[in-house]
Amino acid sequence: MTTLDVLVMEASPGDGVADARRLEEAGHRVHRCYDDDTPADPSGWRPCVALTQGWCPLDEQIDVALLSRSRLTPRPGAGEVGVRCAVRAGVPIVEDGDALLDPFAEWVDHRTDGASVVAACEEAAMAAFGP
């Protein structure tokens, strides 16, 4: 498989750590919507890198977006704002999380559990950009 550029987003801080590690170990490049050095406000919101650094990973070639959700909630969390941007950019969405109460269910192209996140991202990219 070709090296993928994967935009990893988290419903809650830390949700995507294991998924990002798996992707990097498989040779893929991981991108984030947020800079770890930018603190969140009390509600959990923090500005994305487009606001703090003047560029967005989606301005470059992102092959697939991965949303890691560890909890069931019908409302998007502050860290999931990038899902909207990825949908608008036409990037395939893979979700590591349960479909129950998922506010993004209609836009998810592939759903997976943590153990198969690499394969799901590769399959989503191949389906979107393959021959």
Place the predicted regions along the sequence by residue.
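A short beta-strand-loop structural module common to alpha/beta enzyme folds
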Residues: 29-43
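Conserved beta-strand-loop-alpha-helix hinge of the TIR/SEFIR fold
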Residues: 59-79, 89
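Ser/Thr/Gly-rich flexible loops in soluble cytosolic domains mediating phosphotransfer, phosphorylation
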Residues: 85-126, 130
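Hydrophobic/aromatic ligand-binding patch that stacks against planar heteroaromatic rings
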Residues: 22, 82-85
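Residues that mark the start of a beta-strand
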Residues: 2-8, 29
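Structural motif
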Residues: 8-14, 35-36, 67-71, 96-98
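Glycine-rich, highly charged phosphate/nucleotide-binding loops
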Residues: 42-61
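A short, Lys/Arg-enriched amphipathic alpha-helix followed by its capping loop at the start of a domain
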Residues: 18-28
